[in-house]
From Swiss-Prot:
Signal peptide residues on this chain, from the entry's feature table: none
Protein name in UniProt: Small ribosomal subunit protein uS13
Recorded name of the encoding gene: rpsM
Assigned protein family: Belongs to the universal ribosomal protein uS13 family.
Organism field: Shewanella oneidensis (strain ATCC 700550 / JCM 31522 / CIP 106686 / LMG 19005 / NCIMB 14063 / MR-1)
The organism's place on the tree of life at top rank: Bacteria
Residue numbers spanned by region Disordered: 94-118
Pfam families for this protein: Ribosomal_S13
GO molecular function list: rRNA binding; structural constituent of ribosome; tRNA binding
């Protein structure tokens, strides 16, 4: 198994699909990485040479992925909460942020129903 950005990449999959195992790299970015490194998208990871894997590592290192990306996302949410803006308040109350209705839906975000105590 090749190790890129601290993640074990699956050997049996095509390069584009295998790169999506890294948090922060989707299909589009994986295709861009393959194009930049001139590695065929359909080539499997086990078929790549060590030099090609190194070029993949260097190209992935240019992007914000895995722990750094998770940290930045959580810091952005924390900043919104500290500002006290509408989105920050919605995060704090665990409610939907983008204007969805909450009277009947939003069960995923709100969690299980809490019974009314009598």
């Amino acid at each position: 198994m090749a190790r890129i950005a601290g993640i074990n990449i699956p050997d049996q999959k095509h390069t584009v699909i295998a790169l999506t195992a890294i948090f922060g790299i989707g299909r589009t970015r994986a295709r861009a990485i393959c194009a930049a490194t001139s590695i065929a998208e359909t080539a499997k990871i086990k078929e790549l040479s060590e030099a090609q894997i190194d070029t993949l590592r260097e190209e992935v290192a240019k992007y914000l992925v895995e722990g750094d990306l998770r940290r930045e996302i959580s810091m952005n949410i924390k900043r919104l909460m500290d500002l006290g803006c509408y989105r920050g308040l919605r995060h704090r109350r665990s409610l939907p942020l983008r204007g969805q209705r909450t009277k009947t839906n939003a069960r995923t975000r709100k969690g299980p129903r809490k019974p009314i105590k009598k």
